[in-house]
Amino acid sequence: MGNKDFIFNCQFKKLILPNDLREELKKPLGKVFKEIDKVIKFINLKKPKKIISVGDIISCSLIKNKIISDIVIFDFKTRRGEVDEDVKKTLKKFFPIKIVNHPGTISKEALITIKNCVEKILTKKEKKQILVEGEEDLLVLPVILFSPLNSLVLYGHWQLGVVGVLVDEGVKKRVIRLLKKFKY
């Protein structure tokens, strides 16, 4: 199956993370940042076409620094449990689209919602927020897959800090290779 066929077909399936892929997904897909100031400098330097943040802490940190991502994906959780009330309060200001995505999976609903949100931020210039019931960690993969080139995808990495992925053809191909290893 070619990459374009895969991209089209994957949005109609629930993808299940195989155990043997977990270790590979711990590796960052982009540049690692330890401080929000460095993320902001990177944004100002690269001037990405769109900014998409996946994760409560990075999304809230951007908002507090007056940067509202074009798409914000959050679940009110961190690796240590629920986020604190300050983060919840900041993220609750939005009226998010609510979806279900169980841990270790990328739901069909999540795939379709992410694809639709990317289309909307490109055509209608609207900002979108997605509240995930379950877990949002793996959603960084379809976000990269569906994002336009030169977009910046930011996500929290529980051991390293924030990972910034400047979307190009190479990273899209890497994501497709990873997604092809998922079970249906």
Question: Language-model segments: what does each one mean?
Answer:
Residues K128-L154:
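Hydrophobic/aromatic-rich, well-ordered segments within soluble, folded domains that form packed cores
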Residues S69-F76, L149-H157:
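Short hydrophobic/aromatic-enriched beta-strand-loop microsegments
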Residues M1-H102:
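N-terminal, charge-rich interaction modules
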Residues G156-G170, K183:
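Short, flexible loop segments at boundaries between secondary-structure elements
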Residues F94-V132, L138:
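Internal catalytic-core helix/loop-beta-alpha segment
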Residues I52-C60, E133-V140, L160-G161:
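Gly/Ser/Thr-rich loops at beta-strand to alpha-helix junctions
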Residues I63-I71, V87-T90, I144-L149, E169-K172, ...:
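Short, solvent-exposed amphipathic alpha-helical segments in soluble enzyme
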Residues K92-N101, K173-Y184:
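A polyampholytic, Gly/Pro-enriched intrinsically disordered region
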